[in-house]
Structures are given as structure tokens and as C-alpha cells.
């Protein structure tokens, strides 16, 4: 999903709404777990936040159920399908629910200062037909991680262009490094590695008006370069990219077997725990630094089924207070989704480990999550993109098939 940040905050009452009234209301929130152990579960974060909120709002109770990322989207779908939608869900995708008319607009809930504080590209990514339904909750970006010890042994410096990346990978291979560049195009998260490379090649999944451009000339050139200049030359390791999952690539990096790879903030802790000394630089582009980094966001959304718009809005204004946004971001190594918290983090020495990722956020491009077709397109990419760099694969054909399916999915979604 993302390693993304949640802005949990606390604060203000919806402008002009006043108190929540005399009758008790219970809000039900289903949330994803960002912790990597029971001790670090997001449940503890929410429990503490809710305790503070309820102490200030005697007429409102908030019940939070936290599920793993493996289960949370399915759990919410089951609740909605059964006619028992939660008041709030903090999950990975909102567009289908928005298109079905099940969600409140953000402007129906949030105070103007809170709504204006979201980073603009995240707020825009929360829109369906130019109306915001998805409220950004957590964000992350990707940078190029490299193993400092392996680079020193090979006598190389971090790459800034594709040619330099290839030369570095060749030098690492000559030193016996198992994965000079790890290229995880396996089914777990191939859509992320793919998007980072498409951006570094100067294009992406869609154009500026949201039309899929998966088989554009630039994208075909990008995958042709990956196939011919990295994979075919044995610079991506012993596992075929289409069989290599992101989690396995991260583990190999933490075990000192990878020279360089794209990574998000959670890799820092994983590598540090194994004693790997690493550096981080922006993703190289074809002839210089990539024009944009890949960003990922997770979303908060509010269902209309039970009403409670006033209470939901009041709670969300509290959730997105700067102190709460920062607390959540720091706890889980994610990036703030608000300008105020981002500015604070950018100036805070304690957050220096996240500055490389934060620097990428202002120009980051996100998945086209506002398109209801994206879930099907993403699944198709996960399943098939690895074929584009396989020995018998042809990038033109593979990207063309994915584009045709994406166009069809987009057409059915809009009918």
C-alpha cells in the first residue's frame, strides 16, 4: 500500500457547527494497521487519540477497529455490501465508493482551514470528477537506496542518470554483488516499481487530463532500456524481475546482497536493524534527475449511510491537527499530508532521516486513484508487467495489451 502518513490530529470544531448536541452519538471507524508488531499497532495510536477527543466531547463516542492491510479493504467492502457501512474508513482506495454516491464530500465535513492545509497534489488525488471525496491520511515517496560499503568496494558514486546507473550496476556485478540493481516487478507491488521507472523516463500511467498512456513511446523506450541494458546484461540479480517481490528485494538489501534499489521509508529501519550502511539519492532520470518521484497516499473517507456529518467533521478536524499529524508520521516513518506539518518536519533535526523523502513530496505524482478503473489496471500491471523485461518479452506488446485493457476498463467504468 503505501507507506504513507496519516495525519491524525486533533482540534477545532467544524466551523460554525458548535457542539455536537445533547444526544449521544457513536462513530465507528475502521482503520488500517501501520505497525509492524502488536506493540506498535495503530490501535494504540487511535486509542490514545480517541481518549483525548472524547474527554473534550462528552456527547460523542468513537469506536475504532484496526485491521491488517491484508484484510482492511475487504472488511470495509463487506460492511458496505451488508448495508452496515462504518462512519469512517481509513483504507487504500475510495473511488468506487465515491462513484457509487456513498461518501460525503470533504467540503461537507472539514473546516476551511483544515481543508486548505492538505498538500495540493494529495487533495487533487482525492477527487472524483473534480470533487474531493478522498481525504489524504498518509503519504510516502520513493528514493534510490544504495549500499555504501558495496559502492565503496566498487569505487563508484551514486548515479544521477540511467547510463550512470548501468555503469554502477556493472561495477557492482564485477565485484560479485548478487543484485547490482534489484528490479521487483513481481506480483506484490509491481505497479510501484513500474510507475517510478515510467516517471524517470519522462512519462507515467496517465496524461495531464487523466487518459491512460501506458504504451506511450516514452514508456516503451523506458521498458526497452530496462530489458536490454539492465536485465539482459545480468545486472538485476538471479531472480527474474517478474518473480521478484518488493518485500524480498527489501530483505535482500537488508542482508547486504543488493547494490541499489527503489525504496520507501520503512526500508531505513529494516536495513539499519541489520547493520547495513546505506545512502539515499533521488531516482535517476534518463539524462538527469527524474522530473518527478512516485508518491503514495492512503485515504480517509466518510460514509453517508448513518448521517452524523457534523460529528464526523468535528472528529476529523481534531484528527488533522498538526500535532497529531506529526505524531502519527513520526511513529510510523511516514510523511505528513498537511502543509503545516510538512513545514515543521522539514525544519526539525529529529526528522532528518525523512527529509530525503519529504523533499520529493512536493513534486511527487500519485497513482490515478481517482479513476474507478485503476484497481483493475493495477492488478493487470502486477500480473503482467514482468513479461516486458523477460527474455522472450516485447515491451511494445506487453504495454500495448495493458493499455488496451486499461482503455476498456476506463470505458466500462464511465458507462
Model-based region annotation:
Residues 1-95, 287, 311, 327, ...:
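Conserved N-terminal structural module of periplasmic/extracytoplasmic solute-binding proteins
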Residues 40, 107-118, 180-188, 202-222, ...:
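Short, solvent-exposed loop/beta-turn-alpha elements that line the ligand-binding surface or hinge
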Residues 52, 56-118, 154-160, 250-252, ...:
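Extracytoplasmic "Venus flytrap"/periplasmic binding protein-like
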Residues 87, 114-150, 179-180, 290-291, ...:
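A structural signal for short loop-to-beta-strand junctions that line the ligand-binding cleft
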Amino acid at each position: 500500500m503505501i507507506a504513507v502518513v496519516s495525519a491524525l490530529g486533533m482540534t477545532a470544531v467544524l466551523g460554525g457547527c458548535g457542539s455536537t448536541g445533547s444526544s449521544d452519538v457513536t462513530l465507528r471507524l475502521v482503520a488500517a494497521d501501520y505497525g509492524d508488531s502488536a506493540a506498535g499497532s495503530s490501535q494504540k495510536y487511535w486509542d490514545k487519540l480517541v481518549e483525548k477527543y472524547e474527554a473534550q466531547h462528552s456527547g460523542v463516542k468513537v469506536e475504532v477497529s484496526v485491521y491488517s492491510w491484508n484484510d482492511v479493504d475487504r472488511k470495509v467492502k463487506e460492511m458496505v455490501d451488508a448495508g452496515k457501512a462504518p462512519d469512517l474508513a481509513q483504507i487504500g482506495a475510495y473511488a468506487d465508493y465515491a462513484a457509487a454516491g456513498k461518501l460525503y464530500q470533504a467540503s461537507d465535513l472539514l473546516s476551511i482551514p483544515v481543508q486548505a492545509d492538505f498538500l495540493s497534489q494529495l487533495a487533487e488525488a482525492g477527487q472524483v470528477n473534480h470533487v474531493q471525496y478522498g481525504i489524504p491520511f498518509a503519504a510516502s515517496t520513493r528514493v534510490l537506496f544504495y549500499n555504501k560499503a558495496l559502492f565503496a568496494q566498487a569505487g563508484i558514486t551514486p548515479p544521477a542518470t540511467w547510463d550512470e546507473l548501468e555503469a554502477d550496476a556493472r561495477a557492482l556485478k564485477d565485484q560479485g554483488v548478487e543484485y547490482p540493481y534489484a528490479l521487483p516487478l513481481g506480483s506484490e507491488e509491481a505497479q510501484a516499481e513500474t510507475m517510478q521507472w515510467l516517471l524517470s523516463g519522462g512519462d507515467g500511467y496517465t496524461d495531464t487530463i487523466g487518459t491512460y498512456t501506458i504504451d506511450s513511446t516514452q514508456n516503451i523506450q523506458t521498458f526497452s532500456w530496462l530489458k536490454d541494458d539492465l536485465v539482459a546484461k545480468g545486472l538485476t540479480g538471479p531472480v527474474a524481475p517478474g518473480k521478484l517481490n518488493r518485500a524480498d528485494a527489501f530483505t535482500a538489501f537488508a542482508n547486504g546482497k543488493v547494490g541499489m534499489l527503489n525504496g520507501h521509508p520503512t526500508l531505513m529501519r529494516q536495513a539499519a536493524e541489520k547493520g547495513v550502511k546505506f545512502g539515499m539519492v533521488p531516482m535517476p532520470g534518463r539524462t538527469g534527475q527524474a522530473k518527478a518521484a512516485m508518491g503514495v497516499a492512503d485515504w480517509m473517507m466518510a460514509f453517508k449511510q448513518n448521517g452524523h456529518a457534523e460529528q464526523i467533521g468535528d472528529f476529523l478536524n481534531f484528527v488533522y491537527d498538526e500535532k497529531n499529524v506529526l505524531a502519527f508520521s513520526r511513529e510510523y516513518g511516514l510523511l505528513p499530508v498537511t502543509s503545516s506539518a510538512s513545514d515543521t518536519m522539514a525544519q526539525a533535526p529529529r526528522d532528518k532521516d525523512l527529509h530525503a523523502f519529504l523533499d520529493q513530496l512536493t513534486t511527487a505524482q500519485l497513482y490515478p486513484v481517482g479513476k474507478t478503473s485503476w484497481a483493475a489496471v493495477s492488478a493487470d500491471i502486477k500480473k503482467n508487467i514482468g513479461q516486458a523485461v523477460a527474455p522472450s518479452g516485447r515491451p511494445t506488446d506487453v504495454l500495448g495489451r495493458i493499455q488496451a485493457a486499461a482503455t476498456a476498463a476506463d470505458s466500462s467504468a464511465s458507462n
